[in-house]
C-alpha cells in the first residue's frame, strides 16, 4: 500500500472527526484488517491492503444531529460524487479511495438507498451489520480515535456473509482474512472471546459459520466453537 493512500484515509477521518460525525461511524470492510495491526501489536499478525474501498457504517443514522456536506468537505482532496447500481447509491470517488456509507438493514429487504439527508448522501442498507457494531474497539489513528468492530466480530461476520459474494475469489479472500484473525486470537489465548461472540449469534448464523469452516485443515477454531 502506498503511504499516500494511508495519509489520505487518515485525512478523511480527521475531517469527519472535526466535523463532529466520526463518533457516529464504525469503520468496516478491508481497512479493518490493516488497522488491526495495532490491536495485535506484538503478535504474529501481518497484513497488506490492496483495496480502494473504504466502508463506513453508521449504526444509528438518526443519532446524527449535525448538518455536514460531506462531499464538499472532501472535495479539495480530489473526491467526486459517483453513483453505483440502478438505485443510485452515492459514493465518494478518488483515484486512491472509494468511500461508501452503510447502515444496518432493519425490517424487510430493501434495495433502495437509505437517505442521509444531513450529510447530503445516501447509504446502502445491509443485513447482519448490527453484529459488527454491537461489539467495537477504539484505536488511535494519527491524532484521532476511531471505532472498529472487535476482530472476533469482524471475522465471524466475514464467514457469515462470504457465501453472498458473487465472485469466488472474493469468498476466498474473506475466508482467508477471517481464519487468519481467528487464529491470531486463538494463539493469543482468546479462545473464550471467540466462543462468547459466537454464542451471541442466532443458531442459523452459527450453522453458516461452522459450515464455512468445515474444510479447513486446522480444527482448533471449530473445536472452540463446538465446546
Indicate residue ranges for each PLM-predicted region.
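Compositionally biased terminal segments of proteins
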Residues: 1-227
Amino acid at each position: 500500500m502506498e503511504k499516500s493512500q494511508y495519509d489520505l484515509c487518515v485525512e478523511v477521518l480527521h475531517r469527519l472527526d472535526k466535523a463532529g460525525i466520526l463518533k457516529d461511524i464504525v469503520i468496516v470492510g478491508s481497512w479493518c484488517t490493516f488497522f488491526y495491526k495495532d490491536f495485535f501489536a506484538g503478535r504474529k499478525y501481518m497484513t497488506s491492503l490492496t483495496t480502494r474501498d473504504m466502508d463506513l457504517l453508521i449504526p444509528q443514522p438518526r443519532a446524527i444531529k449535525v448538518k455536514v456536506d460531506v462531499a464538499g468537505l472532501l472535495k479539495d482532496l480530489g473526491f467526486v460524487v459517483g453513483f453505483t447500481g440502478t438505485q443510485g447509491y452515492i459514493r465518494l470517488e478518488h483515484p486512491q479511495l472509494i468511500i461508501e456509507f452503510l447502515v444496518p438493514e432493519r425490517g424487510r429487504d430493501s434495495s433502495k438507498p437509505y437517505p442521509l439527508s444531513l450529510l447530503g448522501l445516501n447509504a446502502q442498507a445491509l443485513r447482519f451489520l448490527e453484529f459488527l457494531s454491537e461489539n467495537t474497539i477504539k484505536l488511535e489513528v494519527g491524532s484521532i480515535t476511531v471505532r472498529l468492530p472487535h476482530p472476533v466480530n469482524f471475522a465471524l461476520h466475514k464467514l457469515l456473509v462470504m457465501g453472498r459474494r458473487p465472485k469466488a475469489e472474493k469468498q476466498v479472500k474473506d475466508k482467508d482474512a477471517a481464519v487468519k484473525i481467528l487464529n491470531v486470537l486463538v494463539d493469543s489465548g482468546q479462545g473464550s472471546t471467540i466462543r462468547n461472540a459466537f454464542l451471541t449469534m442466532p443458531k442459523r448464523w452459527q450453522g453458516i459459520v461452522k459450515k464455512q469452516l468445515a474444510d479447513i485443515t486446522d480444527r482448533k477454531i471449530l473445536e472452540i466453537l463446538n465446546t
